[in-house]
Amino acid sequence: MVVPLRGGSDKRSERWSHKMAVKTVSLRLPMQGNTQIENMTKPVTDALAGTGLLAGVVTVFVKHTTASVMIIEDEPGIRADTKAFWDRAVPADPAWQHNTRNAGEDNGHSHLRGQLQGPSVTIPFLDGVLLLGTWQQIVLVDFDTRSRTREIIIQIMGE
């Protein structure tokens, strides 16, 4: 059973009474679409380094419905497999309702891929270092059918 914390002399509430810093960075990244994968690990690491925070979490969020942020082993085989997977799992098809109900649209599959993968990842950090595994990299995947500039929000919460 979860019991809400109360003020006063409750030791648990005292432990959580300090304020946590929140830093937000916005990046704009030109992308080509067609399941393009762009490694975001360095920009995220750089944003974290600029805060001086030692422990907390970093959330990387893309402000678009036809792109996703994920963690992968970023190597050419996985990039090719990722594209092949999405092409098989959610193929481009002019019969998607988004395409048939909206004149000129051809990216219904792009929206569905974005929905399934999701717009964000959250990574813990300690001693100012992301706690990623040896082969884990943060990437942006653009599922759209055309080029556009994507906005990525990096929000860092910690102390």
Name every feature range the model reports, one short phrase each.
Residues V2-R6, K11-E159:
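Active-site histidine-anchored catalytic micro-motif
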